[in-house]
């Protein structure tokens, strides 16, 4: 057994090892022209080294050999079945991993491992450095506006990356494999998919599990069960495969979708060739087809009924006393007709029934084969071998074909090639051979061809040199090189080989190697050490002695005896093959021994000529420094992380973009954004460890992170940062409550509606000005209370508008009582609503005392609207109403029954309160743009609208709005909290809308009410906006605009355009409402319900216990 002298002091500025029983870890550090290796106990961490440098000592890997987890047979062509990552995880083919993005500031990419391969520099060497990855796209990668960050889109695209870019494993499942989606999404690094995206044709496909496919031929199903896990079909047509088998009624064979028809009456399938006469094409869309039997029976039945109806009409013309006899006679005739019709149908089918006996045997055999196929069907995805699913575990199934054509390119979805674009100039040669863009099949088949060529060149020679490794399962031991062109490489050893033994061998070899003081990279060191280990058949002690014999004198290669290779030949080989010593051996093995080749190479490398030549090669490969988009230095092993040592030398202070923290153990590169303001060169806008964790793993900012995402942080600094964040949040809440209490005690606003009323701390007089009592002012001065305009209006805390959802302080109105934030353009309009008295500029009152601030100074004749990055203090309508009435309780929305916290409210015609977004997205409810106008139409909502159940909160009270696609219902406020899509449907009309003067007949009291009762508003003569909402996982239409999206041909958001153009519709709706009230209705009847609390008989909806809507909403106590 090989052992290392633990008392040897390793040349390092940080670590000295003297304890034999210390658990050790191998540390690899790279400088410009050298690599240093040292051992360190796990409890000691370097200041400039992170966990990503650590190669932990692992025990013998006992691989699981049961089905679905791992199989040792059949082995891959190169025998490499797994790889040990620096964090100790073992990755295998068909595992899902997180991969570093080649672009700094982007989140981790998610991929499936297909195979371990070699790049061109590693061909003919003993090292592997690459991995082939099958990509799974996030919605943001393919420009899909989906809020579910755990949703992925599968693909059949692959690339070859360096193995060092793989960070760790993750979990990816199909949606059908997940029983409880919410519980699954609460787990760390867990994702799911149910669709596939092809980037060459920019098209989405359905992904259906093979275990659920029924509607396919038996031989096709058997082949699918053996070789694939998923089926890729056209989007929206995957459900056809889940139905029962569609076999032809005539020939009993499976019917292809485009070569068969279905009877509209009996629902049976027929081949178009089996029908007599044969059908040349299918019926057009919107038309049905019936078979001959059903068509003839329907025609006979129709003619018989026409005759009987004529007889019945003649009988009704007789006297009244003969009506009963005519009725009995018609009934008897109908009974006789049914008997005759049944006899006719039996005679017609008599010829076909003769062949039933001959077909029963074939039908029974078909059912038995189908039954046996279902029994052999795998019950779950874990029963399938992982290696048999390589390289692809899914394939494309063209439902328009007969599913019998099998080619190698048929498994890819983009088989159809696109002709050359007519916009490109063409020549005579192009006309003979038109250019066609590459499809997925072309790219992947070309990649397969290149991999096969490298395998054919490299694998036979590798096993010829080292025959003892043949037919053995090998594992790759990852060794980070920290070079831009070769980030990491793998040493191949059997899976039962001890990692600790390999660590000891590499460390002792490095101590021997560094005494030569050669400016070589770690790639040469790995090539020599693994060659010596293979020469001694994996004996580390013997390999160490052989390496010593190759370097006699420990740094004096001139003591070599025997033949020497010419320096000119070595120089030419280095220029041709670089530092690949294995290529040297292949070229010179017939002339020189292995020892003589290494002696000659080391002597040439130590000579001045060799040093100069080799230094140029190493400088060209190692002098490149990784940087981000702003030129700041990043780590060589992870371009998404900043190098702290180099950042400190620049004397710049990093600050987190989202949480504004300045303390973090690691700093990550922030995603690039468009900078409108000049950049502060003394600061580095980055992401702290907590924000970087959420962004890199899930691809969204920290503000949208769920508690489960924060609980899944594995790093100790992240957990500590989370506790500090929670403490800071609690402190901010306490400060906010104290500020609200102070503001309520000394409100600084006008009340024009209340003439005189006395409260505890202040008095309202006829001049609509609040006179604060002296004791309140004195207490405020003693406690050094800040003005209300100096609190919570910092630039670091930008507010989010409750109406359009845009974050920013430009033109923002903040209610100083409830904290509701709205933009001035989203709520206050210049055309109407004299709201200058409601606005008090925060900067205008910053230098006033408490007494002076009681009288808001508004310049007469000028509007005090907000400027850029200026926040205005303001009181919303709900808070002003509570102050006028002397109430302290929150108002509740009549549509969702939730309080008015951080959401703008308006009054209704009936005297209730309603959220502005609830009323806007509820159909048949009119929302006026003017603040003083009430909301109309809630009392006219039908009772069934109050009975729908919300998909988010699970309650059935209030009014829910349904999605136009899936029909999912939810309260508008619940949908906003659950990250549903609230937006508008942008509609272009072919005809001009109605006008008030010319088309008065379009009003409701003239008969047509569809265009008036809806929420659609016209933004110009030909376009309109209609509020709609969609679920988080639904496919959005192309004409859908979010609330904060810019409307085409305008510079305003969709919400501001919508609320601005609602005003002209007010007169039409009020006229309609007035006429509808005056219009006579059905005669009044006795009211059956009476409220048990207020004895009221008027309510749009009655709740259990005979409670009216007003009492249920806590409007009457």
Curated annotation (Swiss-Prot):
Cellular component annotations (GO), alphabetically ordered: chromatin; Lid2 complex; mitotic spindle; nucleus; protein-containing complex
Residue ranges, annotated region (Disordered): 361-380
SMART domains according to UniProt: BAH, C1, PHD
GO biological process: chromatin remodeling; histone catabolic process
Cysteine-cysteine disulfides: none
Keyword Zinc-finger annotated: yes
Pfam families associated with the record: BAH (PF01426), PHD (PF00628), zf-HC5HC2H_2 (PF13832)
Zinc finger (PHD-type): 245-297, 798-882, 948-1002
Xref: CDD domains: BAH_fungalPHD, ePHD, PHD1_Snt2p_like
Highest taxon listed in the record's lineage: Eukaryota
Gene3D superfamilies assigned: 2.30.30.490, Zinc/RING finger domain, C3HC4 (zinc finger) (3.30.40.10)
Zinc finger (Phorbol-ester/DAG-type): 227-282
Domain BAH: 89-208
Subunit architecture: Component of the Lid2 complex composed of ash2, jmj3, lid2, sdc1 and snt2.
Protein name: Lid2 complex component snt2
Provenance organism: Schizosaccharomyces pombe (strain 972 / ATCC 24843)
Top-level taxonomy: Eukaryota, Fungi, Dikarya, Ascomycota, Taphrinomycotina
């Amino acid at each position: 057994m090989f052992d290392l002298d633990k008392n040897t002091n390793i040349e390092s500025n940080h670590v000295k090892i003297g304890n034999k029983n210390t658990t050790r870890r191998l540390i690899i550090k790279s400088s410009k022209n050298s690599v240093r290796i040292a051992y360190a106990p796990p409890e000691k961490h370097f200041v400039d080294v992170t966990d990503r440098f650590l190669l932990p000592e692992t025990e013998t890997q006992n691989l699981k050999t049961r089905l679905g987890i791992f199989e040792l047979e059949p082995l891959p062509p190169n025998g490499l079945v797994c790889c040990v990552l620096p964090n100790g995880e073992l990755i295998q083919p068909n595992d899902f991993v997180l991969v570093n993005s080649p672009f700094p500031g982007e989140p981790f990419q998610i991929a499936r491992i297909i195979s371990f391969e070699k790049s061109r520099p590693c061909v003919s060497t003993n090292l592997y450095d690459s991995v082939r990855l099958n990509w799974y796209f996030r919605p943001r990668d393919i420009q899909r506006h989906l809020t579910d960050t755990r949703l992925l889109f599968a693909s059949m695209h692959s690339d070859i990356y360096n193995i060092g870019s793989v960070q760790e494993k993750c979990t990816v499942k199909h949606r059908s494999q997940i029983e409880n989606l919410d519980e699954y999404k609460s787990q760390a690094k867990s994702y799911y998919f149910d669709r596939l995206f092809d980037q060459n044709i920019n098209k989405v496909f359905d992904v259906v599990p093979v275990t659920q496919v029924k509607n396919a031929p038996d031989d096709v199903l058997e082949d699918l069960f053996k070789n694939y896990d998923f089926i890729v079909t056209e989007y929206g047509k995957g459900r056809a495969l889940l139905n029962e088998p569609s076999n032809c009624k005539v020939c009993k064979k499976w019917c292809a979708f485009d070569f068969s028809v279905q009877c509209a009456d009996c629902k049976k399938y027929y081949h178009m060739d089996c029908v007599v006469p044969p059908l040349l094409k299918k019926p057009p869309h919107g038309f049905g087809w019936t078979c001959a039997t059903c068509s003839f029976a329907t025609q006979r039945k129709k003619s018989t009924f026409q005759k009987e109806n004529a007889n019945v009409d003649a009988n009704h013309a007789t006297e009244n006393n003969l009506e009963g006899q005519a009725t009995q006679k018609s009934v008897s005739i109908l009974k006789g007709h049914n008997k005759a019709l049944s006899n006719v149908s039996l005679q017609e089918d008599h010829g076909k029934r003769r062949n039933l006996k001959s077909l029963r045997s074939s039908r029974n055999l078909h059912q038995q084969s189908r039954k046996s196929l279902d029994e052999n069907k795998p019950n779950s995805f874990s029963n399938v071998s992982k290696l048999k699913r390589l390289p692809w575990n899914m394939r494309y199934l063209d439902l328009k074909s007969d599913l019998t054509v099998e080619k190698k390119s048929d498994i890819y979805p983009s088989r159809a090639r696109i002709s050359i674009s007519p916009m490109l100039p063409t020549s005579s040669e192009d006309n003979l051979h038109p250019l066609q863009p590459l499809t997925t099949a072309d790219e992947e088949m070309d990649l397969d061809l290149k991999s096969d060529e490298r395998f054919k060149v490299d694998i036979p020679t590798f096993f010829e040199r080292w025959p003892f490794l043949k037919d053995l399962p090998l594992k790759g031991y990852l060794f980070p090189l920290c070079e831009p062109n070769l980030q990491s490489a793998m040493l191949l050893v059997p899976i039962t080989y001890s990692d600790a033994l390999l660590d000891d061998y590499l460390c002792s070899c490095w101590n021997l190697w560094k005494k030569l003081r050669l400016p070589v990279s770690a790639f040469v060191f790995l090539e020599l050490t693994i060659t010596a280990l293979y020469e001694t058949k994996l004996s580390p002690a013997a390999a160490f002695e052989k390496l010593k014999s190759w370097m006699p004198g420990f740094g004096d290669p001139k003591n070599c005896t025997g033949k020497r290779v010419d320096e000119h030949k070595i120089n030419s080989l280095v220029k041709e093959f670089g530092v690949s010593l294995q290529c040297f051996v292949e070229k010179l093995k017939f002339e020189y021994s292995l020892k003589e080749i290494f002696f000659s190479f080391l002597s040439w490398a130590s000579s001045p000529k060799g040093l100069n030549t080799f230094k140029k090669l190493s400088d060209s490969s190692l002098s490149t420094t990784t940087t981000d988009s702003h030129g700041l230095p990043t780590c060589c092993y992870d371009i998404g992380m900043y190098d702290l040592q180099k950042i400190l030398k620049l004397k710049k202070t990093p600050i987190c973009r989202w949480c504004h923290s300045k303390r973090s153990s690691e700093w990550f590169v922030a995603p690039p954004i468009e900078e409108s303001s000049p950049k502060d060169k003394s600061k580095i806008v980055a992401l702290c460890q907590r924000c970087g964790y959420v962004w890199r793993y899930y691809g969204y900012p920290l503000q949208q992170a769920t508690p489960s995402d924060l609980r899944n942080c594995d790093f100790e600094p992240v957990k500590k940062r989370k506790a500090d964040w929670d403490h800071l949040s609690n402190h901010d809440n306490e400060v906010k409550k104290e500020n609200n209490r102070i503001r309520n005690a000394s409100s600084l606003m006008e009340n024009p509606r209340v003439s005189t009323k006395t409260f505890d701390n202040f008095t309202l007089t006829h001049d609509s000005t609040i006179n604060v009592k002296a004791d309140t002012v004195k207490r405020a001065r003693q406690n050094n209370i800040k003005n209300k305009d100096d609190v919570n209006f910092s630039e670091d805390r930008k507010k989010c508008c409750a109406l359009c959802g845009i974050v920013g302080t430009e033109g923002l109105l903040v209610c100083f009582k409830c904290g509701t934030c709205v933009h001035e353009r989203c709520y206050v309009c210049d055309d109407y609503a004299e709201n200058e008295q409601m606005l008090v500029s925060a900067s205008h009152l910053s230098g006033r005392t408490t007494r002076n601030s009681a009288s808001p100074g508004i310049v007469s004749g000028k509007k005090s609207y907000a400027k850029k990055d200026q926040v205005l203090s303001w009181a919303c309508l709900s808070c002003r109403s509570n102050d006028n009435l002397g109430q302290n309780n929150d108002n509740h929305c009549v549509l969702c029954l939730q309080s008015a916290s951080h959401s703008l409210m308006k009054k209704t015609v009936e005297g209730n309160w309603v959220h502005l977004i609830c009323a806007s997205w509820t159909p048949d409810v009119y929302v006026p743009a003017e603040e003083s106008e009430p909301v109309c139409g809630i009392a006219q909502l039908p009772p069934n609208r109050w009975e729908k159940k919300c998909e988010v909160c699970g309650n059935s009270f209030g009014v829910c709005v349904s999605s136009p696609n899936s029909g999912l219902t939810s309260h508008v406020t619940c949908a906003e909290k659950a990250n549903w899509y609230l937006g508008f449907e942008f509609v272009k009309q072919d005809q001009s809308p109605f006008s008030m003067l010319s088309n008065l007949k379009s009003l409701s009291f003239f008969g047509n009410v569809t265009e008036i009762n809806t929420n659609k508003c016209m933004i110009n003569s030909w376009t309109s906006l209609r509020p709609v909402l969609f679920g988080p996982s639904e496919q959005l239409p192309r004409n859908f605009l979010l609330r904060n999206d810019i409307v085409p041909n305008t510079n305003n958001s969709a919400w501001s355009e919508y609320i601005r153009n609602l005003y002209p519709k007010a007169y039409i709706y009020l006229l309609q409402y007035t006429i509808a009230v005056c219009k006579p209705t059905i005669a009044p009847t006795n009211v059956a319900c009476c409220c048990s609390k207020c004895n009221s008989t008027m309510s749009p909806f009655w709740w259990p216990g005979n409670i009216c809507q007003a009492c249920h909403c806590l409007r009457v106590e």
